[in-house]
Structures are given as structure tokens and as C-alpha cells.
Amino acid sequence: MSLQMVSAVSNSSLLQPGSSLLNFDGHVFFFGQKGWPKRSCPTGVFFLDIKQNELKMKPAAFSRDSCYLPPLRYPAICTLRGNGESDKHQYIIHGGKTPNNDLSDKIYIMSMVNKTTKKTTFQCIEKDLGGDVPEARYGHTINVVHSRGKSMIVIFGGRSYIPLAQRTTEKWNSVVDCLPSVFLVDFEFGCCTSYILPELQDGLSFHVSVARDDTIYILGGHSLQNNTRPPSLYKLKVDLPLGSPCVTCSILPGGISVSSGIVTQTGDTEFVLVGGYQSDNQKRMICNTIVLEDNKIEIVERVSPDWTPDIKHCRMWFGCDMGKGSVLLGIPGANKQLISDANYFYILRCNKAEEDEEEELTAQTCSQASTEDQGDSTPFEDSEEFSFSAEASSFDVDDIDTYNEDDEEDESETGYWIICCASCNIDINTWVPFYSTELNKPAMILCSSGSGHWVHAQCMDLSESMLLQLSEANVKYFCNEHVHLNKGLQTPKKAVHLKKQPMKRLHKKKTMKLTTPVKKSFLRRLFE
């Protein structure tokens, strides 16, 4: 096992606990940002471009016949293989949290319809469900089982909000474990059936599940009711005859106490379990190999990688399966840093063949890519310490149809921490926000001299009102070094003086005309 650090070039703050990674044709895509999508990527799906140990995120598009897919954190995700010898597959997404902390009970089918060097297009379809529909939840698992030429979707575990009748202002966002029911979903017709098994007594969430043929193994998990991580190991067997399905459960020995573990597949019958937690404040640094053969499971401990000191001493970590024995791990940066999106990312390669193929990352996962689950038991997720926001403007893309990936290749020259002029004093280590609109990067403005270059607004001594005026107005700006060139090339236009109209008095008294007696007698005789 090898551990390698990657540097995030752009928009790394979008990668948060609860996010998911999808693999299509060897290309890894990110889904499930914490906030609502920005205009630069309205779909919320990004292509992870990892080259030369640098991670870049590029927006993806949806087809016109796609439904709306909100960014969901902690959903249940699994793959559905195509028929025949086709390598194409679809992803099934169920449940999860929206940015408004609402829980989803919908199920989506996501597939790739077009892939070019500059643009990737997906199709997302919402599947209608009927019968015993699973309630809205998160932190659960979804798997596909195959029996007698048929396929079924199996949903188990997770957390949900307390019933609406019991919700008060103080307990509005309180969550509980879902009932330990097993749901079978007919993928073709959308019919759902729930099963209550006597072996499953307590609800579980953030557990690990791996499937092979008609059998699902459920390992570990966290019980919110008891606040424990029981070393449980369940075996679910699903038989699909011509009549009603038959679901049986058995308790096996040799379980592991782990929650939020990450499973990656390294072979046809071999999986690797990494990461997770063994208590509320202790990470699980041990790795295990899971082998599924001859209708049985074998879990053995394997040699762990050389964890870096940052990973060993951090309080939390998160990650997702990238496929073929590769896992993306993330840890938050040091608290003393002023840059709020300073996340550190590592790629853990569990397969020896993949250690030599850094660019080939494909995924064949049979379980949910479990993520950090302490957002509900401890205030990590919504605290200011780990609150990040995405800078959508760093993509510099107004229309996804005209997106040019070559525009992102020059970020080293047009970054926020360049030396914009001779008197530039912006340093990444000492910079603090100067304008009220700044958050974690200094405000910059484009100088229109020549081919154009970016300068810091603070180095140009621009006031905040002037900066806002220049950003809203459609005018050219010239920095302090090129402003004299602009004056010499342009002749000032003569200002047209407007004549000031005198204001009329609102209450002007009319002059009274006096009529003499002679005029009165004349008028009287005239009308007689």
C-alpha cells in the first residue's frame, strides 16, 4: 500500500465529508458538494482531473432530457452493470442530505451519454417508487443482488429525522436510527417491499456493505440509540424465485467495530477496508482485506501504509473509493491557517498494479462509499472550524457549452497569489481580508493594457466603493503602471454642459387685475 499526497489546484473546498465519487469509463467524477451549485457548474458534478499529483475540478453537464439532481451528501450509491458484454454501467443514487438539510427519499439513475476532451454530458432520470417506499434517510447502503436471472436493489440502514409530530423547535433537526428493515426494490417496475428480520434488532448507519451474487455482507456501523459501534457482521441472502422473494439473515462471527469505513475492490473477490472510526474521538488506522469466496467471507488484517503525521494527529478524515484499489483521502488543514479551503488530499493505492498506473483510476464498488459520520454526534460538520465555501468565479466559465479546459492551464500565472506589480505586498502566509467582499482570497481586477493581466485591488489602493463600481460597470480599467499610457493614447472628450432649467415655484400667487368703474359700465351696456 502506498500513500501519495496530491495538491488541489482549484475549488478543493467543494470536496467535503459526505461527498461521493463516480467512475465512468475510467474517469472519476465528484458529486455532492455542501452548498448549492454555482453558475459555473449548475449540475454540481465535476470531473476530477489528476495529473502529475495535481487535482483539478472541471464542470460537467446534463442532457436536456435529464431531471434535476440536487447535491446530496451521505447518499447510498451503487453501480448497475449493463446487459451482455458491455462495460457501460449506471449509478443508482438514493437518499442523502440537500444543502438545506432536507432528506431525500428519491432514487436517481445516472449514466454518461457523451464524453469529449472538453465536455462530459450525463443523463439523470428519477425513478418512480411504489409500495413500501423507504423513508427519506442518509448514511445507509444500497446494493444490487442477482438470483436466478433476476436483479433486485437492497436498501438497509441509515438515519432520518424524528417524526413530524414529535419535532419541536429545540429538536427540529434531531435524527434517529431508521428501523432495521430490509427493502427490496424492483428496478424495472419500481415496486418496494419491506422485510422485518428477527436477527436485525437495532438500527445501523454508516456501515459497510459488500455484495456478491445473491448475498450481502453488512459490517460494522454506528448505533445512534446506544451510541456504540458494535463489531457486528450480518449475512443477507436474497432468493428470487418465480413467486415472492425470500430474504434470510444470519449473524456471523468475526465482525469489526468500525463506522464510516471506505471499501475499494482490488480483485474479483477481494476488497480492502480502510479509514473510518472505532470511537467518537479515535480514527481507525488499521486496514483489512475482505475476501468473498464459496459463499463465505474472510476478513484479515493487512499491513497499513505509512500514515503521515498530519493524518495521525488530525481529529477527522473523509474519503471515497476511486476504484481498482485507489482511495481518495482528505483531512482539514491546520486551524491556524487563514485560508479556509486548505484541505489536504492523499491517494491511497492498495493494489500493487495500480501503484505503477497513476492515471488509470476505475471503480467497481459494491457498497456505499462511506464517509464521515461525526457531523451528527459532534459539531464538526456545521462548525465554523470546518465550514468551507466554493469560489465559483475561479472557474471563469459563463457558459458550460463554451467551456474550454485550456483556460485552466494558466492558473499558476493568473492565480491569486502572484506578484502583480513592483509594490505588491500580498503574501499567502500573512494575508488577511481587506475588503468586506473578501473571504479566503484577495480581490483582483483585470488591467486592460495589452493582452491584459490581473492585479490585486489592495495593491492599487482602490477603495471598496470604487472596486464595486468598477466590477459592476462595463468599463476598462488600467493599473497604476499603465494608466499613463492610457491617458496618452486617448484624447479627453469635451464635456457637454447642460443648461440648468430654473425651478418653478410650486405655490405662485396669481396677480389680481383691478377693474375700473368705467370698464364695468361698458361691459354692462355691452351685454344688455
UniProtKB/Swiss-Prot annotation:
A GO term from the CC aspect: DNA recombinase complex
GO molecular function: chromatin binding; histone H3K4me3 reader activity; phosphatidylinositol binding; phosphatidylinositol-3,4,5-trisphosphate binding; phosphatidylinositol-3,4-bisphosphate binding; phosphatidylinositol-3,5-bisphosphate binding; phosphatidylinositol-4,5-bisphosphate binding; sequence-specific DNA binding
Comp. bias regions, Acidic residues: 373-383
Record key words, sorted: Chromatin regulator, DNA recombination, Metal-binding, Nucleus, Zinc, Zinc-finger
Binding residues annotated for Zn(2+) 1, in chain numbering: 420, 424, 456, 459
Pfam families given in the database record: RAG2, RAG2_PHD
SUPFAM superfamilies, sorted: FYVE/PHD zinc finger, Galactose oxidase, central domain
Subcellular location: Nucleus
Origin superkingdom: Eukaryota
Coiled-coil blocks: none
Region (Disordered), start-end ranges: 364-383
InterPro entries for this protein: Gal_Oxase/kelch_b-propeller, Kelch-typ_b-propeller, RAG2, RAG2_PHD, Znf_FYVE_PHD
GO biological process: one example: V(D)J recombination
Keyword Calcium included in the entry's annotation: no
Residue intervals of every PHD-type zinc finger in the record: 417-485
Record text on subunit structure and interactions: Component of the RAG complex composed of core components RAG1 and RAG2.
Record-stated family: Belongs to the RAG2 family.
Domain comment in the entry: The atypical PHD-type zinc finger recognizes and binds histone H3 trimethylated on 'Lys-4' (H3K4me3). The atypical PHD-type zinc finger also binds various phosphoinositides.
Protein name: V(D)J recombination-activating protein 2
Native source organism of the sequence: Gallus gallus
